[in-house]
């Protein structure tokens, strides 16, 4: 039996959900909508994101005026794109824990990060069985430099451990 796996991976979307170039008012060449339309939605494809969703674009800035509600909108967009798994990027902490957890709680996708502890909705690892019977282990890591870069008040109750040892431990679990 042929057991193929297709992985579609994005990272650093930074709220660029549309391909609209806001400066010119014309379609641009980037944005989640440009690549998400080509994602296969079958039982042997995993759609993954490496984080940095909540901050960066003019639209993300507009959403950040009401960050908890804005995070729900970002999650809805990711849901429409059909993501299965995401991890947390360093900029996903920028709007605080409540905003991050709002985003994660409204996702259809599961969030995996082997080195983030204390945030609701984060799993260390996951295993899925594809339609063709292939079992796939999934994990992610978040840069531990978040501990240096992020405002301490945005990390209250959250620990971001060293990435490489956490990834090695997750691999052993899988």
Language model features by range: what are they?
Residues 1-174:
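Acidic, metal/ion-coordinating pockets
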């Amino acid at each position: 039996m042929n057991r193929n796996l297709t992985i579609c991976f994005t990272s650093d979307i930074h709220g660029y959900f549309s391909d609209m170039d806001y400066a010119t008012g014309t379609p641009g060449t980037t944005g989640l909508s440009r690549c998400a339309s080509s994602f296969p939605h079958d039982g042997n494809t995993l759609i993954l994101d490496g984080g940095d969703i909540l901050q960066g674009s003019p639209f993300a800035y507009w959403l950040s005026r009401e960050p908890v509600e804005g995070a729900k909108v970002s999650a809805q967009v990711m849901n429409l794109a059909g993501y299965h798994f995401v991890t947390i990027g360093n900029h996903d902490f920028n709007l605080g824990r409540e905003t991050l957890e709002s985003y994660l709680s409204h996702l259809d996708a599961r969030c995996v990060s082997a080195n983030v502890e204390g945030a609701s909705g984060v799993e260390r690892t996951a295993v899925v069985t594809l339609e063709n019977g292939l079992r796939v282990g999934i994990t992610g890591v978040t840069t531990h430099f978040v501990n240096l870069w992020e405002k301490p008040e945005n990390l209250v109750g959250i620990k971001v451990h060293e990435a490489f040892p956490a990834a090695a431990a997750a691999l052993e679990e899988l």
